[in-house]
């Protein structure tokens, strides 16, 4: 009887302590220091997975099995040797088993992805938009590095990007208002926001891929050889689904400028000739990231200049 009374007496206290603990954990999680750190660390882990995608997708291998191993000796990498960035630094950039040098690409991709996820949190907050742009950034990392290494832009990554971008369009705001502008001129009432967002995504994909297809076809007819693969066209469909029409055009412009500058520098330094195949997808990916984080302020600044004139 005494034990039962003690149990009944302690039970409310247990609930109180549990409630206090839950509130405390929530406050710590919502603090301004833990969430950015969590976003960065999660980005590092995702970056480790992106390395697997970069290496295996072009070779048409599974990104799930087998476990990661040293490309030289084939020894499976232990979990404690697979900690993003940190393991590479501890091992001195070498395989623990055969001492073969491990490419700096691995920690670079992990660190880049971590920083991009951190930037998505700071710019978009703890929102669905932040998740959308984090996934978009991860896709761009895979496409950019793969094109730089292999000169290909895998269809599986591009089509996955199109599908994910269209899916997110139903849960996020319209990207640039192009669909709303069209609706105001054709309808007496604006369509629902998910419809506007979906139309914005489709317009971005059509304009992005269509513009690059016209450029590629024109180059082929003028020069008699391909100057741009269809991978770039499909990549811009994925980029356009996420960014919408206006920022997709800005991406093409930014990517073209980056590619032109790098190409001129390489030729002027006599390191490459005029027929050198530049990885245009790499520059498009870099341009898309620049537009993602700086495109809206740049567009607002440009529109303000036009308004002044």
Go through the PLM ranges and name each one.
Residues 39, 135-260, 300-309:
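Functional transmembrane core segments of multi-pass inner-membrane proteins
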Residues 230-231, 265-290:
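Interfacial loop-to-transmembrane junctions
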Residues 29-37, 103, 107, 127-130, ...:
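Hydrophobic, aromatic-rich alpha-helical transmembrane segments
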Residues 25-55:
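Long, highly hydrophobic alpha-helical transmembrane signal-anchor segments
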Residues 50, 54, 116, 120, ...:
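Alpha-helical membrane-inserting segments
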Residues 53-105:
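Membrane-proximal soluble regions of multi-pass membrane proteins
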Residues 56-64, 122-126, 148, 173-177, ...:
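Transmembrane helix-loop junctions in multipass membrane proteins, especially transporters and channels
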């Amino acid at each position: 009887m005494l034990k039962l009374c003690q149990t009944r007496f302690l039970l409310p206290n247990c609930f109180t302590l549990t409630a206090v603990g839950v509130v405390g954990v929530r406050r710590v999680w919502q603090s301004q220091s833990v969430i950015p750190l969590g976003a960065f660390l999660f980005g590092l882990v995702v970056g480790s997975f992106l390395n697997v995608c970069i290496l295996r997708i072009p070779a048409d291998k599974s990104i799930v099995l087998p476990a990661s191993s040293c490309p030289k000796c084939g020894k499976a990498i232990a979990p404690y040797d697979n900690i993003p960035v940190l393991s590479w630094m501890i091992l001195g950039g070498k395989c623990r088993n055969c001492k073969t040098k491990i490419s700096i690409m691995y920690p670079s991709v992990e660190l880049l992805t971590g920083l991009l996820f951190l930037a998505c949190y700071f710019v978009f907050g703890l929102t669905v938009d932040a998740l959308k742009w984090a996934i978009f950034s991860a896709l761009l990392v895979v496409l950019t590095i793969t094109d730089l290494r292999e000169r290909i832009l895998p269809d599986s990554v591009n089509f996955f990007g199109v599908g994910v971008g269209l899916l997110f369009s139903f849960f996020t705001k319209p990207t640039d208002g192009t669909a709303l502008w069209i609706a105001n001129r054709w309808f007496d009432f604006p369509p629902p926001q998910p419809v506007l967002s979906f139309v914005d995504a489709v317009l971005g994909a059509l304009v992005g891929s269509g513009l690059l297809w016209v450029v590629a076809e024109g180059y082929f007819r003028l020069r008699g050889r391909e100057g741009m693969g269809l991978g770039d066209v499909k990549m811009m469909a994925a980029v356009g689904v996420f960014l919408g029409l206006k920022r997709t055009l800005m991406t093409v412009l930014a990517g073209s400028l980056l590619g032109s500058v790098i190409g001129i520098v390489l030729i002027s330094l006599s390191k490459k000739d005029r027929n050198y195949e530049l990885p245009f997808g790499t520059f498009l990916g870099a341009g898309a990231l620049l537009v993602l984080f700086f495109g809206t302020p740049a567009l607002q600044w440009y529109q303000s200049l036009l308004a002044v004139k």
